[in-house]
């Protein structure tokens, strides 16, 4: 079996909220949980997972993948995306005093140059796929709205493709899906 959309570095929100996992849990604790999640996933019969973002845990998915590949811990084969790419200001955590820089659950980038740099950096750090949020809940009343232009999404796809990587997009709106499809995204979640 293949799990096509996992987040091994998260645990259920009824245990701890997403904000608390990103802002309060040490990365080492999140990795320790991920080791258990990887083992349980394999024991459930999944031999491969596509892990679609560390949600604030940096590049820990790359190390988890390496530990499994080297036989240090049991787990399924992993295809990793490292840090999802989001438009500046569009993702979470939100609602904090604007004077403070708050750790983000994904990597913010904008424009052709910024997106090119971020995609290449993620590839350098071990991303097998690139994940982008084509839309998110950042409208005036928190409703989902597209986050990137078609040109920006096309840039992400072109840079990823130049190194043989595919792009997966989070999209829940018709316009976000349309833009992602036109840009050449391989998978929409």
Predicted regions, residues:
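Glycine-rich, aromatic-flanked loop segments that form ligand/cofactor-binding clefts
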Residues: 1-5, 66-92
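Metal-associated gating/positioning segment near the N- to mid-region
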Residues: 1-70, 151, 175, 182-183
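Conserved, mostly hydrophobic/aromatic
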Residues: 2, 45, 78, 122, ...
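Active-site gating loops and adjacent loop-to-helix segments of metal-dependent hydrolytic enzymes
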Residues: 8-29, 88-104, 138-146, 181
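Short, acidic/polar
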Residues: 30-40, 108-123, 171-177
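Divalent metal-dependent hydrolysis catalytic cores, especially in the metallo-beta-lactamase
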Residues: 33-59, 75-84, 127-138, 166, ...
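Active-site core of metal-dependent hydrolases
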Residues: 88, 132-189
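Active-site gating/metal-coordination segments in enzymes
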Residues: 94-154
